[in-house]
């Protein structure tokens, strides 16, 4: 990502909108025992388009804001979202991010990693983590719901962050060279 005041403003608006929607509406909306976790998808989208450093910073800021707004134990969400942001950003740096359906898999993997890591950290800190088979079902349903909502969230995030991106993954896909039209392979260089 290009570091500028506009970039900080765009990412801040995205995170603030995600946290407000998460706490005011989506956390009360239970679907089959799970819920949509918009903050994880917003952090994953910023990391997917901005890289690992932007993912770490975005994850920490979103987790800190979410912990402050919800009154949860400080640092748990920011620690886990920092790791999720770094992991998604590192994946983007190593792999080609230009496939159109890759946000589905990235959103599912980020959500699954967040749910497992958040449960582990909460259990280690004894923050009232419950151990039950229903928790596993809720984690699977939450991961599937986030996978369904990943594509619209990633598309909206890309449109919001596009002026701040160094490389737009969709432009890479559109600018691929057409196949060369030359003569038969054996006659190259003979200028026939």
Task: Tell where the protein language model's regions lie, with residue ranges.
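Terminal, non-globular segments
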Residues: 1-192
């Amino acid at each position: 990502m290009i570091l500028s005041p506009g970039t900080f403003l765009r990412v801040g608006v995205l995170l603030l909108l995600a946290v407000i929607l998460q706490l005011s509406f989506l956390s009360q909306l239970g679907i089959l025992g799970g819920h949509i976790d918009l903050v994880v998808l917003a952090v994953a989208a910023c990391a997917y388009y901005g890289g690992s450093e932007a993912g770490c910073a975005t994850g920490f800021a979103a987790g800190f804001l979410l912990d402050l707004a919800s009154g949860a134990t400080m640092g748990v969400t920011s620690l886990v979202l920092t790791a999720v942001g770094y992991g998604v950003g590192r994946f983007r740096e190593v792999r080609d991010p230009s496939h159109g359906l890759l946000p589905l898999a990235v959103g599912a993997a980020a959500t699954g990693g967040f749910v497992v890591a958040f449960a582990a950290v909460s259990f280690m800190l004894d923050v009232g983590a419950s151990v039950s088979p229903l928790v596993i079902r809720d984690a699977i349903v939450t991961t599937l719901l986030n996978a369904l909502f990943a594509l619209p969230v990633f598309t909206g995030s890309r449109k919001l962050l596009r002026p701040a991106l160094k490389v737009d993954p969709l432009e890479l896909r559109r600018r691929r060279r057409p196949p060369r039209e030359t003569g038969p392979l054996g006659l190259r260089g003979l200028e026939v």
